[in-house]
Amino acid sequence: MENMDLIKRNVQEIVTEEELTKLLETKKHPSAYTGYEPSGKIHMGHVLTVNKLLDLQKAGFEITVLLADVHAYLNQKGTMDEVRKTADYNKKCFLALGLDPEMTNFVYGSDFQLSPEYMLNVLKLTQATSLNRAKRSMDEVGRKMEDPKVSQMVYPIMQAVDIALLGVDVAVGGIDQRKIHMLAREGLPGLGFKAPLCIHTPILLGLDGTKMSSSNENYISVDDDEAALKKKFKKAFCPAEDIENNPVLELFKYHITPRYDEMVFERPEKFGGDLVCKSYAELEKVFADGSLHPMDLKNGAAKYLNEILEPVRSVLE
């Protein structure tokens, strides 16, 4: 697969493709980062961006992972000691998912976010950002709160400064990070920093058909064992012949087919015998025309995700 195809695989948006093309033409090893707030278990929604970092690493990018312990503290996710322990757990998960330990730079927010240089740039960006703009950049939970904390408005400002001081070319995140990334593109040049390119991945559906979230308990954790996976998929929303907003198909599209050249769905002879698919497009077709039953799709998802997550479970045991 060509580098540009790897970079664009399973991406919802690139801001901008023209800038990306120029970057690849002028820099042999561009840099990219994703920040993760250490606030709970890593689930397959998080792994979407890890997959993209893996693609970028294969395409020659230098990768930085920000373990944003200060962000988590400001977002009321625990004491600094608690969020640091969660950050260490995150790091183990990301390495077990395939990030190259020799080619990935893991940075804790507390390593640089408390420095005078960092805080001065945060203050400069707050001066250049309106209150309404800061509110729009808050996460969904913060925007819906009747009386959010000031720290929750500073959070997106800090995220923009993270990009600047880490010195990366590309910011990677879910499409829900778009407003923060646009704030960085608009505000950082005024502080003397370059505007980052942005790569946005989709938001993964939870097993009930809504957004995958630890708070909704509709997620697959990277440390779920085989029994837990089978139990969760048995209850998963997966209407027959429906390829729109189907969470089980999404898991194949974003997590399984990029890792397997072919998928075998094991079935008794009386139900047609084993069915082999060699691409996501082929899988979607046989599910849409009724050749593949939802339960067979679910069983296949449980089997392949169990294999994908085995290295993570081994590290965490």
From Swiss-Prot:
Its EC number is 6.1.1.1. Coiled coil: none annotated. Keywords: Aminoacyl-tRNA synthetase, ATP-binding, Cytoplasm, Ligase, Nucleotide-binding, Protein biosynthesis. InterPro entries: aa-tRNA-synth_I_CS, aa-tRNA-synth_Ic, Rossmann-like_a/b/a_fold, Tyr-tRNA-ligase, Tyr-tRNA-ligase_3, Tyr-tRNA-ligase_arc/euk-type, Tyr-tRNA_synthase. It catalyses: tRNA(Tyr) + L-tyrosine + ATP = L-tyrosyl-tRNA(Tyr) + AMP + diphosphate + H(+). GO terms for molecular function: ATP binding; tyrosine-tRNA ligase activity. A motif ('HIGH' region) lies at residues 38-46. It is found in: Cytoplasm. ATP binds at residue 214. It comes from the Archaea. It holds the Pfam family tRNA-synt_1b. Belongs to the class-I aminoacyl-tRNA synthetase family. TyrS type 3 subfamily. Homodimer. Catalyzes the attachment of tyrosine to tRNA(Tyr) in a two-step reaction: tyrosine is first activated by ATP to form Tyr-AMP and then transferred to the acceptor end of tRNA(Tyr). This is Tyrosine--tRNA ligase. It comes from Methanococcoides burtonii (strain DSM 6242 / NBRC 107633 / OCM 468 / ACE-M). The lineage of its organism: Archaea, Methanobacteriati, Methanobacteriota, Stenosarchaea group, Methanomicrobia.
